């Protein structure tokens, strides 16, 4: 067989490394490994602690309904929504305090993420890529996604994100 020049082999190895890294990133994006390692509540607690460590944010976390997040689809969607929301708050909100809660009313899970930042313009609320992704995740599970601003005061209106997911899976049928 023909031998390849060393620089060609080096280039091919570099391209293969990039491809492997990309595949790992994509698979992690689909379902974060931390959810498998820690479970939903602990994964959210870990992520919140990491964000708080590297920022000025005071984040209060209250997850009394975490045991109701008992399937991969809901766990992934809710984790990603918390992750994306905290990223947006860090980048844009100029907030100091964030409250993240997960509760249940018996029929639905309700995830609420509230900050005390500067609020959000309408054009971003409608079309930001992260918000579109959150909305799509919720819709895929048969839930509701709401975002509101100006609920706290004129000076610091903040943002409230509410996600309502039915406790019964979107495609589950009730068998009597």
List the model feature ranges, each with a label.
Residues 1-176:
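Coiled-coil dimerization/phosphotransfer module
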């Amino acid at each position: 067989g023909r031998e390849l020049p060393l620089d060609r082999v080096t280039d091919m190895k570099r391209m293969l490394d990039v491809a492997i890294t990309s595949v790992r990133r994509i698979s992690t994006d689909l379902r974060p490994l931390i959810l498998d390692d820690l479970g939903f509540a602990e994964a959210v607690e870990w992520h919140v602690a990491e964000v708080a460590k590297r920022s000025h944010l005071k984040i209060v976390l209250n997850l009394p309904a975490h045991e109701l997040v008992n399937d991969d689809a809901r766990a992934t969607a809710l984790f990603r929504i918390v992750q994306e929301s905290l990223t947006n708050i860090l980048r844009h909100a100029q907030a100091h305090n964030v409250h993240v809660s997960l509760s249940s009313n018996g029929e639905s899970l309700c995830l609420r993420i509230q900050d005390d930042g500067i609020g959000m313009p309408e054009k971003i609320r409608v079309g930001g890529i992260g918000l579109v992704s959150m909305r799509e995740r919720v819709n895929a599970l048969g839930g509701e996604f709401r975002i509101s601003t100006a609920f706290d005061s004129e000076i610091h209106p903040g943002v409230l994100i509410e996600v309502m997911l039915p406790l019964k899976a979107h495609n589950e049928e009730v068998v009597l």
